[in-house]
Structure formats: C-alpha cells, structure tokens
Amino acid sequence: MDAGPAPAREPRRIRVLVVDDSAVVRNVFQQELSADPGIEVVGTAPDPFAARDLILERAPDVITLDVEMPRMDGITFLHKIMRYRPTPVIVVSSLTPAGGALALEALAAGACDVMCKPGAAYSVGEMTADLVEKVKEAAAAGVRAPAPLPPPDRAATPRALARTTLQVVAIGASTGGTVAIERILAALPPGAPGIVVTQHMPELFTRYFANRLRDRSGLDAREAQGGESVVPGTVLVAPGSRHMLLRRSGARYVVEIKDGPRVNRHRPSVDVMFRSVARAAGPNAIGVILTGMGGDGAQGLRAMRDAGARTVAQDEASCVVYGMPKVAVELGAVERSLPLDRIAPEILRLAGEAGG
C-alpha cells in the first residue's frame, strides 16, 4: 500500500545562547527570541565561564554577548570564541561612552553586529524586532574572518585633487564594515575628496565610530549634522537611526539629515544616501560598497553608475559577508571589484582622472 510522500521536515530552528550578567536582560532576550518559531534559545549564561560550558554542550548557531561583564570582559571572551570555536556573535552594549568604545572594539575583534540594551531610549518592542532580525541574518551569514591585510600605506595625493572641491566619495557598508572603512580611510591622504559614509549601526554608536575613524585615520571624521559641507579631508558619518542625503548648494555639497521610514529594513540606509549622491553629484562622485548582509545600497549604486559616477565594490575574498557587494555586482552597478587593500588607491586614481 502506497503510504504517500513523507511529510516535509520543519526547517531547523536557529540555536541561540544569551550571555549577559543582567538577569533582567537574559530573561527579556529569552522571552522575546523564543516567541519566534524559527529561533530556539538553548541557554543563558551570566558570565563567560558559564557560557564556555554551554557553548561546548549545546553548540549554538548565534551568541548574543554583553561586552561589560564581571570575571572576564566580553572582548576577551570574544577573542577566545573566534580563536577556538568561531560562532556569529551579536554584541549587546549599553549606550554609554565606555559601552560604545567596547562595542567598536568587539566589531574589530570579529563580532558580526552590535545592538543596544533596551532602556528609556530604546523600547523592548523596538529591541525585539532588531534582535530577531539580527539573529536570523547572523545565522544565515555565518562567521568568516576577513583576509589578512598588510599595514596600510598612506597614498600620495594626486596633483589634480588639489584643484577641485567638486568631487565626493560615498561609502556604504554593514557587517564587517567598521573595520573595512577604517582601513580605507587610514590609507587616504589629508587632501582626499570629501567622503560621506553610511554604516548600519544603532543611534549614538555612530558618534563613537566617527571619533574612532578620526583618531585612526587622521582625517576630519565626525558624525554628520544637517547643513554641513562635504569638503576635501572631511568624513561625515550618517547618524544612527536617521537617513543622510547629499544635495548641491551652489558650488558645494552639503548633507541633509532626515527621519523617515526604514529602507531595506535600515535607517540609515545606504540606498538613500547613494541615490541622493547620484542626483546631486552625478559624474563627480565615486561610490564604494563594502562588506555587509542583505542588498541595501545595490540599487542606489546602480543609480550612481547610471548618472555617470565611478563605482567600486569590495571583492568576495576580503569581505566578512559578501552580501551587499554581491547584489550590486549582479545588478550591474559595479565597475570594479577589488580587495579591501586596493580600494583606497583606486579611489585616488579615479579622483585623479576626474580632476585631470
């Protein structure tokens, strides 16, 4: 007798370990994550020592990790995870200067994303939507260390750059982007074209990120404010939770900072920035799309290329997550895909051609 087709297997749920010294945060995360049918919380731990045993016993697919904990700090534990049992890690941090600095250090150490603890400025409802999305994206992306890079060489400024203030470089990134952007800017000279950056990152963390870029690159990097001019040697970073657009104002470019709905599930959105650059700067722009999950920025980069801008993508081998550049390449938005350490020289080469 024919028993008919076997019933389809349910998709495997994402196994998550929550590590936080706050019992309240552990309970909230467990409750909110467990409410999603695609996620299973396989354990919670108050410190890295308890977490270590659970990692070995229960093999989580994703770990949420508080960076400020007793007994062993989250950064030290993150290094151990990446060395001995690489696992996608979402760093959870308080909105404080110390927490922001630690979160950026964690991203540099291999964490795939960062988010804020719920509080007065960040409701549990907002946190839940972000947390579930980040867990699913982290599980899909997996963990992958970027290719090792040589120390950056600061390139010489092409002579043509000094003769123009009309050029602008737009850089968009997500997962792995904080390190990639830092490497690019560290290799650019003080006279490089003005740069606008959209990096997917929560509110307030972008301020710490901009400060880190300033300290590490020597360029005048800061979190953008509406009406600021984009001039050579400056780097304006889109503030978290708000979109950044470029517009022409006479002979110069200025940025607009706007609220509004998320685009491609993100605010700030790379697509929003790239599309505005296409309209405002056209052939005077260079667009760069870097490592990151999803497809934000691909359509906007295509709009830039269609408007005459030069476009570059980070190649697969040097990406932490080859998502955003991959979609951009598939859309025909990219002129050249390059290893991370060749992107800064390419920016200067293209700027020199345009200024010559």
Swiss-Prot record:
It comes from the Bacteria. Phosphorylated by CheA. Phosphorylation of the N-terminal regulatory domain activates the methylesterase activity. SUPFAM superfamilies: CheY-like, Methylesterase CheB, C-terminal domain. GO terms for cellular component: cytoplasm. It catalyses: [protein]-L-glutamate 5-O-methyl ester + H2O = L-glutamyl-[protein] + methanol + H(+); L-glutaminyl-[protein] + H2O = L-glutamyl-[protein] + NH4(+). CDD domains: CheB_Rec, REC_CheB-like. GO terms for molecular function: phosphorelay response regulator activity; protein-glutamate methylesterase activity; protein-glutamine glutaminase activity. The active site is at S174, H200, D296. Residues 162-348 form the CheB-type methylesterase domain. It is an enzyme of class 3 (hydrolase). Coiled coil: none annotated. Involved in chemotaxis. Part of a chemotaxis signal transduction system that modulates chemotaxis in response to various stimuli. Catalyzes the demethylation of specific methylglutamate residues introduced into the chemoreceptors (methyl-accepting chemotaxis proteins or MCP) by CheR. Also mediates the irreversible deamidation of specific glutamine residues to glutamic acid. Contains a C-terminal catalytic domain, and an N-terminal region which modulates catalytic activity. This is Protein-glutamate methylesterase/protein-glutamine glutaminase 4.
